[in-house]
Amino acid sequence: MTTCTLYGKTKKTLTDAVGAAVFALLLLQPVLDVISYWATVFECSAITTLARFAMFALVMLYAFLISDRKRTYIIFAAALCLFWIAHMIACFKAPGGYKSPVADAGDFLRTVQMPFFTLAFITCFKKSDRVPSYVQAGFLVNMILMMHFLILSYMTGTQIYTYVDARVGLMGWANVHNSQSAILAFVVPLILFYIYKMKKPVLFYFTALICFVDLFFVGTRVDYFSIPIIGIAMIFFLIVSKEKNPAYYVTLGAIVVLCLICFNSSVVNSNLYNHSVNMSTKQSYIDDTLEEIHTPSGNPLPSHIDKETFDSLPPRAKYEILKIYELYAGPMVQRFGFERVFEEYNYSLKVSELTAVRNQKKLFAKMVWDDSNLLTKCFGYEYSNMVVDYKTVDKDGVESVTQVIYDLENDFPAIYYMGGYVGFAFYIAFLAYFALLIIVGLITRFKKLFTLESGMVGVTFVLMLGIAQYAGYVLRRPNASIYLSVILAYIYWLTAVRENVKLRDIFKIFSKNRNF
């Protein structure tokens, strides 16, 4: 048997199993998340990290073997390798040199998995029209698995709450709560579509109720506000699909309205209240301190001042403000100095602004960026720049060092700073390609693409981008970004494969021949 013959048979065997392979890969995700949680508990998380990288390598090898366009994979990999080389050069040229190449490489590999997985899933979708059904079924089984793991965590008394200190919110076993809550929102639209296709109304009502109740009790704002978005979108596209059974609309509408009416009893509202009380307590300390400080004109110091007012204060007053900043933004003050941090906060003395974690991380990243040279801004700075070894001294004079990580939660700013102008442009262009496929497809083939299936895929895509920007932990967390990869490949299949949509079709709109 020749090598070509053996390869041909191997490729056919692998291609025939493509649907099952995608299904198995999706089912593996919640299992890996649980294993990762327990590995962290037992301080052996490196094992699961290696397992995910091994899975990534195997998936890419599988997709490469069955692909008819291997050159695309090679070009894609070569482009990213060139970018990584340029990024490393920028890190070496940066002040202080390349501090932690290993940690930086790990962050890079986590970030680039999404586009690579997308390429692999596109290959899988192109090989079989049954893959979309496997994806829908995979999302359903994933939700079932996640719910069973949640129940098991409570049965064993090992559950983790969404908000640990307040002990509220159903989370189960999860390392990164933002990612887990995002995943739960991601899978619901296609689950509802999959069950709807079965034409079993009672099963659909039950599934919708369970999914939305789960999102309600998880307790994150992401999941809570996903309920009306998904519910209203489902109702709208059922209308588009000319569904005649009014029970679908009544049931979905009733569940959404019930969740909205019960906001005051929700975990989200409880957490907002607890946060407000906590902020009031902390603000009282600042207010008590500010009562002793007055402007040169004798007026009490407001919660926002300007540089001129600050410069006019006596040394004792400046020292009190310094102590406030050291208390609530100590690592930032140690890294950049008090005056610069005070200026970045626009001379604020409001505790809600000083202690907002996302805002702290954004300001920290911005200051690191401002200190970077042009080469670094082109290709991004390294991950270790977001880490501070914060030194403190207790009342007995004993010094301790705590590692504080300011890694950005919001994905797009993180990619901008870590990837620079070039990396960010590549990432945005990659996502924009699929968005343009949707736009061109709707303009040129509206009736064929404006369907319930396309609508649920589109809603999932919009949710993913919104959550990546405003909540984060999607694009740079492989356990969440793999779902985005699936949806991007699904979009490609709906448009470029099934309807033969091409970006250049947009120019045909202005031509006399509009046969698409």
Residue ranges and their predicted role:
Residues Y328-G419:
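Long extracytoplasmic/lumenal interhelical loops at the membrane interface
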Residues S241-L349, D370-S372:
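A membrane-periplasm/extracellular boundary helix in multi-pass inner-membrane enzymes
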Residues M1-L65, A86-A94:
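N-terminal signal-anchor transmembrane segment
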Residues S36-T48, Y205-E243, L258-N274, D287, ...:
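Helix-loop-helix junctions and helix-breaking kinks within/between transmembrane helices
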Residues T48-M55, F76-I89, Y98-C124, A137, ...:
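Aromatic-anchored transmembrane helix interface
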